[in-house]
Swiss-Prot record:
It is found in: Cytoplasm. It comes from the Bacteria. Belongs to the ThiI family. Residues 61-166 form the THUMP domain. The keyword Transferase applies. One of its GO terms (biological process) is tRNA 4-thiouridine biosynthesis. ATP binds at residues 184-185, 209-210, 266, 288, 297. Pfam families: ThiI, ThiI_fer, THUMP. This is Probable tRNA sulfurtransferase. Keywords: ATP-binding, Cytoplasm, Nucleotide-binding, RNA-binding, Thiamine biosynthesis, Transferase, tRNA-binding. The gene is thiI. It comes from Bacillus cereus (strain G9842).
Amino acid sequence: MMTYEYILVRYGEMTTKGKNRSKFVSTLKDNVKFKLKKFPNIKIDATHDRMYIQLNGEDHEAISERLKDVFGIHKFNLAMKVPSELEDIKKGALAAFLQVKDDVKTFKITVHRSDKRFPMKTMELLPEIGGHILENTEDITVDVHNPDVNVRIEIRSGYSYIMCGEHMGAGGLPVGVGGKVMVLLSGGIDSPVAAYLTMKRGVSVEAVHFHSPPFTSERAKQKVIDLAQGLTKYCKRVTLHLVPFTEVQKTINKEIPSSYSMTVMRRMMMRITEQIAEERNALAITTGESLGQVASQTLDSMHTINEVTNYPVIRPLITMDKLEIIKIAEEIGTYDISIRPYEDCCTVFTPASPATKPKREKANRFEAKYDFTPLIEEAVANKETMVLQTVEVVAEEEKFEELF
């Protein structure tokens, strides 16, 4: 019985790129290679319009599961490679069809003749190949409109690829082609989703988390570490900066009117994050804000908060409602971590009546009464930085270190 020998990857949005497409292809190949480190026998060939992964006996199902999480992949197919001879193509199409699930009742054949010198036309090939499958199966019919399985055949010079089992990729662009941003990672539901959607646009992320011991616990800190760890499923690594925020918050609580304490706190976070962004050569700041969700996420609040940074502030969730955000969080595996009942620094000092329409003039006037600069610099200087990778990669590195 024939087995799958290749996975053919289609790029999707990357095909709209022009002269710089080679950069996108190269980055995607590098990301796929990193994602599939556990499979040493594979060989990856990335061309201008698609990628070919030669399996060489590796587990195609396990590899397929990993490819689903790689940004830049639109779709991919399991494939067999056969000589470009009619009988070989017919046998290969039947073998590929027989490997799909038992509950399949209908199919169609799709043929693409990349080699126009092949002696038979597409309309001549369809009944030949389809008829061969019908003759060698039972209770199977052709459905060209809504088939259970589409047997795709790509005829090239000398050899042909036969594909079944189409899988959807993660879409978007390869992580790394779009620069780097700092993501404010609070520990809630929204910010990990914002990080995920930012990565989907090809942007590398580093996370900044503000914690305020003893008001926030070690369990709350670990929760954020686990969230950052979870995001490594979609990239090579996530660098997490843990910023001590206790003194800043205590001073805000003491010096700033309570109605403006939330606004000023967010402004301080932006100032600190901007300094870290400068150190780390990041080009923007990403937040998990959704318009109108809480008092600090009104247009007036965002207008006042934005004043303190010259960096672009990316808000991927800005027009989403909570249910849409939760749906994505569940799909990417961060929801169950986010709902762990540990408070973060934004909740422990929440004012009773925060201003929903704060003004820049008032915020500046309140802040001018106290010099926050030393506190900001101290918070940046005392941050804890850790680099997180997928559990598999960490295990491999530890195993390698044990050899020495």
